[in-house]
Amino acid sequence: MERQLIRKVSDEWTVPPQLTDYQSVCKNFSWQQIEAELDGLPDGRGMNIGHEAVDRHANGPAAESTALRWLSKDGICADFSYAELGRQSNRFANLLTQLGVNKGDRVFALCGRLPSLYIAALGCWKQLAVFCPLFSAFGPEPIQQRLSRGDAKLLLTTEKLYRKKVAPLRTRLPQLKHVLLVDSEEDLADEVLSLPKALARASDEFQIPATDPEDMAILHFTSGTTGMPKGAVHVHQALLHHYASGRYVLDLRPGDIYWCTADPGWVTGTSYGIIAPLLHRVTNIIDEAEFDSERWYRILSQQQVNVWYTAPTAIRMLMRSGLRPRQATDLSHLRLIQSVGEPLNPEAVLWGQDVLGLPIHDNWWQTETGGIMIANYRATDIRPGSMGQPLPGIEAGIVQQREDGSVEEVEKPGVEGELALRPGWPSMFRTYLHDEERYRTCFKKNWYLSGDLATRDADGYFWFVGRADDIIKTSGHMVGPFEVESALIEHPAVAEAGVIGRPEPTIGELVKAFVTLNPDFEPSDQLRFELLGFARKRLGSAVAPKEIEFLSQLPKTRSGKIMRRLLKARELGQPEGDVSTLEGV
């Protein structure tokens, strides 16, 4: 099938892109030059995300510029200037110190898109605590796993979420010393405190300690196909990549109105929902509400958004809604739409151009990379369906594994292989928390192996093929089969469970579970609904399966490992491939 091309014409730019000559910028790029554009801590005391994102603006001429504009579910609009954000994050940093939080201690946030989360993140980085955001849609079990594995010392959450999802777990979380409730005016217990009350007593003056660029700053959990969720560790130096990609990919500049729709529990919601926009001194739109097509069009218009960063799932939901921006909806301020989360189909790219007046630019990266690695840029031609070209400073390639386990780069265009990156960019994860061995397996022959299959065409554009493992991408979430299977087999009826992702046009993949039953149970619709509810209660709606199918037995290897690959092939009617290790063969 002939691939389409969207050509960019410079005459159409009312505001010229920050990156106009891709090849020249790549050739002359250096991370040292990027670092030289930032302040660093006074007196050469290092590099700190909180300082670069807020304090260098709060202490200068832009102090009263709007940093955050929060839109509540019920219509309240609250603005926070850089100066106010600086003072509030100082209060939070002082509060952490008062509560005994030390450098490197993990502070978790479970509260959705509320101003307190953004203030807390910045306060953590200033105080040298480690910020660890979680999806508020998680159920008790995923929360407990991540708090335990992350050695959570303090948790920021709402009173409702605490009572429903955290309080029942407290006996299993001995390392959790304090809980701060963002919406409670009174303390619930000695260790369950009202955040507003505590902040009111804290000083709004704080000096950021000396910060090594390699000091741990962020912990993001990402699911694995086996075992527990992996905690990807990122450091303060990551801000260099957030700054560079904010300029070259998101085309951010001071004074822009910017809206990233991602939840902070997802790495996009932290890297590009907090850090990158504030580094560039924009007004960062924070919408508390979930997806609503009319509301989203209204925000784009009323807030005069210049740059919009969203997800393919949301784009496809807008497409399926059938709604088009009304005649009164003014999108003339919008100059760039970027998308990430799963591959963006060509139809969606072209729909953006037809309905919104701009093509949608796909880009690719992972929790482990910490920032955008491959992208379509505002000034470069788009090949709908392609993830684009590597960022300046990033070397990407296609590699294939040899029989001896080593890897070699594939130079020939159009050959499928694993997408790999040369290590060393600033936002690259530094380890998996408590799992250095697993971290080492991600690297071979000076390549970081992404686990994604792709091809590269003759012009250097990369094209996504599929996952090299069993990770399920659903609505932008990374779901590990093992986590879902583990929850299902806690039900007395379930003997075994195998979980796959089934392609679904709107959300990317739908989580489907295959289960076998214990002897005293029989398949029925009633039991199926019971299991769906059971899993949803434990895992939350973001992770729980949407479909369950009963089987008499699951395909397994002779060693007892469930062959999810075979389950998926049978579900999709695809060739089963090598079944030599299948039990009973």
Please tell me what each predicted stretch does.
Residues 196, 305-310, 319-382, 395:
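Gly/Ser/Thr-rich phosphate-binding loop
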